[in-house]
Amino acid sequence: MIEKYQLRVLPQQVFSEQAVIDFLAKDKGIDARTVTHVRILKRSIDARQRTIFINLKIRVYINEPPQDNEYIRTVYPYVGDKPQVIVVGEGPAGLFASLKLIELGFRPVVLERGKDVHERKKDLSLITKIQKVDSESNYCFGEGGAGAFSDGKLYTRSKKRGLTDKILNVFCQHGASTSILADVHPHI
């Protein structure tokens, strides 16, 4: 049986599956021995009062193994011999446009006037040290776009539209921690 629950736990309980199961058993009256797996679907911090709590939305597997993957894996087709499409810019929009083109069976050719991230670091240090700006390689132009040197915090005001879940799945498929799927404000 698969059930969904919402729990309000202390921070020290959230990172141990057994602690979550024990809390669930006590709070919801479930026999902890029957819980085979707990998957955290959403996690947020409630720091409005003196005691900080973590709000969890969880999927609980009772007497059965988990049936789903943590994230959806996209299988990209081979497009080496397909028609080319030019994508301008290697920022987030260009990279996701390229992935979508591959899904649709096209071969993207990405054009970027800036440098790769490692070379951009050198150019950015020149901006701060001697105020020398390279018009082709700076905070805005180059691999990763303007977000390459951000703090990694992604915010969206949209909860009901857009492809937020798909984008987070793509990040996980390419090496991001699966915790970003559960965190309300993921740090990527």
Which residues fall in each region the model found?
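Extreme N-terminal leader/targeting segments of oxidoreductases
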Residues: 2-83
